[in-house]
């Protein structure tokens, strides 16, 4: 297994492209992380929209640059809205990303996510336990937390990517991005990032946005992971704990975009 790495120059170019295109991201995400997710996208130069009403979700999925489906606070009415949005995204060729939160621990959301896979997501982003469960390798995880190392999920991620045609992202101490054949590893970040609710969910939104960019989708998604880890490292250096981390993290994302515009 060969794991490729990406250069800082490539990352900076991709971030410049991201800011230039300013993707409009339809975020059907969970209630806990909506504000943080929106602010993360804004800091990087994207435009978030949290449209969840069933009658509007399908309409908005047709005009958005990208769609995010995050099942963290899934309910039956929300599942209906998500289903409508995904079906419209498929018709409109809007790229969409699935974040299968806690899919290994809860049956209803696992069945729902497996149903959505038939609509061919552009990307899937989860921790090791979630990706392994979605691939049918194992069930588990402690709710939203993983009980497996990211590297252990690489074979499952490759299988899932080949079966669905999606780019699969396994996040952890090292993030891995694969299309079933190529694998890119992204190092960095800090353990403090796991002490703040929503960093993974926000990453999924950035991944969704990157699916709307021109060029190599796998590499663009890998850059999303790199930007988040890079901003996390900068934020931790200025923080005293989780409470002060969040504003420093948003500032760091913003500063990254300003640096590539200079």
Swiss-Prot record:
ATP binds at residues 125, 171. It is an enzyme of class 2 (transferase). The keyword Disulfide bond does not apply. It catalyses: 5-(2-hydroxyethyl)-4-methylthiazole + ATP = 4-methyl-5-(2-phosphooxyethyl)-thiazole + ADP + H(+). Signal peptide: none annotated. GO terms for biological process: thiamine biosynthetic process; thiamine diphosphate biosynthetic process. Its cofactor is Mg(2+). Its EC number is 2.7.1.50. CDD domains: THZ_kinase (cd01170). Pathway: Cofactor biosynthesis; thiamine diphosphate biosynthesis; 4-methyl-5-(2-phosphoethyl)-thiazole from 5-(2-hydroxyethyl)-4-methylthiazole: step 1/1. Pfam families: HK. Belongs to the Thz kinase family. Catalyzes the phosphorylation of the hydroxyl group of 4-methyl-5-beta-hydroxyethylthiazole (THZ). This is Hydroxyethylthiazole kinase. It comes from Escherichia coli (strain SMS-3-5 / SECEC). The lineage of its organism: Bacteria, Pseudomonadati, Pseudomonadota, Gammaproteobacteria, Enterobacterales.
